[in-house]
């Protein structure tokens, strides 16, 4: 897969391209998961130094052994969980909160726990 970097492209379009190029090709992805990803811009959940590449198909390393998983892996995990809108979800080690934000569009309640304050700032 080839990605072309375009300066000043807005987050919504980058997010849409990520969904089309990385998540939809997985096949069988539930519509509600695609909608959840559409409503959360990945660049809102990464530090400034990672924003330029945050929509690429790779994990985003934050520090030490902490990172934000690549979007297609998050989508596979969330799909396997088969979360309903009546469920409460606990996310332990939520990092920057990106996956929690997506899950919040699917579940009744999401509680995120992160011990590293730097990742939340």
What does each model-identified segment do?
Residues 15, 70, 99:
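Hydrophobic (often cysteine-bearing) scaffold residues that line and stabilize catalytic clefts
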Residues 21, 76-80, 105:
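Residue-level signal for well-ordered alpha-helical scaffold segments within enzymatic catalytic domains
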Residues 57:
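Short, conserved active-site loops that position catalytic residues or coordinate cofactors/metal ions
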Residues 27-28, 43-50, 60-78, 82-83:
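Conserved SAM-binding loop and adjacent beta-strand
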Residues 82-121:
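Conserved nucleotide-cofactor-binding alpha/beta core module
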Residues 2-49:
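N-terminal auxiliary segments of SAM/dcSAM-dependent transferases
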């Amino acid at each position: 897969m080839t990605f072309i970097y375009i300066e000043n492209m807005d987050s919504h379009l980058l997010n849409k391209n990520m969904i089309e190029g990385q998540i939809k090709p997985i096949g069988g992805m539930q519509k509600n998961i695609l909608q959840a990803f559409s409503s959360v811009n990945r660049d809102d959940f990464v530090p400034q130094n990672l924003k330029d590449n945050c929509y690429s198909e790779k994990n985003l390393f934050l520090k030490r052994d902490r990172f934000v998983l690549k979007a297609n892996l998050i989508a596979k995990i969330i799909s396997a969980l088969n979360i309903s809108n009546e469920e409460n979800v606990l996310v332990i080690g939520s990092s920057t909160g990106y996956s929690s934000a997506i899950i919040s569009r699917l579940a009744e309640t999401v509680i995120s726990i992160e011990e590293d304050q730097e990742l939340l700032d």
